[in-house]
Amino acid sequence: MRLRSPYWLFVVLILALAGLQYRLWVGDGSLAQVRDLQKQIADQHGENERLLERNRILEAEVAELKKGTETVEERARHELGMVKDGETLYQLAK
């Protein structure tokens, strides 16, 4: 019984191609997994940008608090309801 080599070579090549396709679509490092990781990276970049902007705002606020008393005075008036000596506070009811 003699094996026809082109037939077996064809079968081996088809099996190798099927194995590679399986890894491409389903296995570790598949296209779906790469797409999910790219989405996670994009989401993380967005979150990082949001946090960087928040940090810039907080840094500016801290610098303003360190440099002047205007901001401290404004926060004391609005958040704590404080008034200066000699001032009278009038609250209007709605």
UniProtKB/Swiss-Prot annotation:
Keywords: Cell cycle, Cell division, Cell inner membrane, Cell membrane, Coiled coil, Membrane, Transmembrane, Transmembrane helix. It is found in: Cell inner membrane. It is a single-pass type II membrane protein. One of its GO terms (biological process) is FtsZ-dependent cytokinesis. Pfam families: DivIC (PF04977). Residues 27-94 are periplasmic. The chain crosses the membrane at residues 9-26. Residues 1-8 are cytoplasmic. InterPro entries: Cell_div_FtsB, FtsL/DivIC. Residues 31-78 form a coiled coil. NCBIfam families: PRK00888.1. Essential cell division protein. May link together the upstream cell division proteins, which are predominantly cytoplasmic, with the downstream cell division proteins, which are predominantly periplasmic. Part of a complex composed of FtsB, FtsL and FtsQ. Belongs to the FtsB family. This is Cell division protein FtsB. The gene is ftsB.
